[in-house]
């Protein structure tokens, strides 16, 4: 068995196990010597905890960064993006330019968001500026649409506060932290239904930042036609695209799973909105993903034993502006349809080809820069070393004349060096 990768996983999914077995890798237990561990976020917390005192050797790699939650917890993601904006502002970067109303021209890509209970007073102040607005509340550490609800009255928050057995939002209680975000109430609709994008982004290293976009993302549609009517605020089949919720709807389609490929979306938008604005939209999606990664890179523990495949959730509004909603550390590997199973099998296959070159025993000291021919359906989204090597002022894109962000960017390598674009 010498020379064969020994693998462990605590996530029993066929798309994972079939990929390991296809490579002739050998399954072992976590108590034996292993080279590759595809683990849950709970396990990664234990592996890297001070109490455990576990040290990974050079021939071991895992699929999460130790403090991935700086990006994948809703509250910390927003906190880091806000800090990133302030730092760019302090530097005088053109990226931090604002309009006459004080809104960021280029960095306004997450909905207005507050942390509860900490930011309750700030939220109330903002709410009173637009009392007819709708807000969406989400628990910071949950996924699959659990614990989410919409509100359009302060009294609803106060009632929730009482129901949560907390005496006051102003006091720091031990209750579960929530974020409350301005709800995008003008989403782009197709067939009258709301949808979002699930995009896969692989990060092999944060310093230098090197990330890849998977070309086979998809759209997730709601089963019930969208209405901003306040009478439907409680109907999650109208508002939340999560498959975990939509699959319980009467109109859920088990054949296509309420999903479209990103390529189908692109074709639809090119035919209804035009090729130029569609290209601009996808450039902007690239832009906000790179900026979100740049925002967390300084605080991320760039452990050489780690890589991570994130699930990015993006909503497009009716003006074709993309919004970053959240980033998932463990995007679902459950297959809801036959096409879903093929997509996720190929996603894992391509991820492993990049993370474990040639399927050989890992060496965490390698430069994490695989040859282009092994990328499969991934394409380089951003490579900090290449960007710096070519000069921070140069825009590396295959479609000239379509800048994203300020044209005069000179500070802090703006992150506009998108190496490839959606095909």
From Swiss-Prot:
SUPFAM superfamilies: Glutathione synthetase ATP-binding domain-like. Mg(2+) 2 binds at residues 326, 328. Mg(2+) 1 binds at residues 313, 326. Keywords: ATP-binding, Cell projection, Cilium, Cytoplasm, Cytoskeleton, Flagellum, Ligase, Magnesium, Metal-binding, Microtubule, Nucleotide-binding. It holds the Pfam family TTL. ATP binds at residues 138, 144-145, 181-184, 194-196, 241-242. Residues 1-367 form the TTL domain. Its cofactor is Mg(2+). Its main location: cytoplasm. This is Polyglutamylase complex subunit TTLL1. It comes from Rattus norvegicus. The gene is Ttll1.
